Amino acid sequence: YMSYLAKNYNRKKISFKYGRGSYLYSTKNKKYLDFVQGIAVNSLGHAHPKLVKAIKNQSKKLWHVSNAFQIPEGEKLAKSLCDKTFADYVMFQNSGAEATEAAIKVARKYFYSIGKKNKNRILCIKNSFHGRTLAAIFASGSKKMTEGFGPKVPGFDHIVFKESKPRFPKLRSKIKKNTAAIMVETILGEGGIKPIPDKCLNYLRKICNEKKILLILDEVQCGIGRSGDFFAFEKSKVKPDIVPIAKGIGGGFPIGAVLMNKKAASGMIAGTHGSTFGGNPLAMAVGNTVMNIVSRKKFLNNVKKSSKYFLLNLNKIKNQYPKIIKEI
């Protein structure tokens, strides 16, 4: 078998014909329970009837139009996101990496717009994950991700997160005069599936207020209902300035977005950022459908209920096999 795809993925020798709900069906007619879900993407499973209907209906009307014009479907989704969250404004993208890059631009442009042109550094957690684009991998601070992609993209500093010392003891010393923002994943992904404790998130907010810098909470992977709340940071009552999202908001369709409060968004005037495909009518029709379902209390309560069930029973299995399973 000759593949003409680049070798940047170590693909398993299995392919699928179709999916239904939580199941995938292979080209060899095997049924699989899909625990991967496209890596935190298929928030409503495979081929959800309402998503199929939304794509079908919108595809008959309009797929793409330039952002030089108003897009009602995008206006609707932006309003829903703002009504549900801390945000005052939304910029649509196509992926998580795009959303992260845009979040960095928003933070830097804000300070530039108020006359602080040298205030542009972003403080991140070492070995986090913010995407695969050039700035994003250097924001992540992982040698594994950045090796071979030099020269180093400047503008990023790093702190270490340890569960034993969740309050970032060296945080204050890492914030310089030219620091513009702190950017962290609310739940570390590549860093080991480690939630940032609520007290720690509140501490970050306090420090950002004190130092007059912005707080960016990356919810690309942990947001859109995965934690049982619409955003994972909601339980902490913290209000960030900027939040990049993607993955689950599209339910399998490429959608990303940056949510911003009025202050953070003030520098983003016409011409400062753009996306050819971001916010297109077809994507927005899908996003509105996902939003209508995932934002409901009943849906989120079911996530919490399912989470308790899995934690209880997975811990039972862990206790049975302590040498095999280290942590749940």
Roles of regions detected by a PLM:
Residues 1-328:
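Conserved N-terminal phosphate-binding loop of PLP-dependent enzymes in the Aspartate aminotransferase
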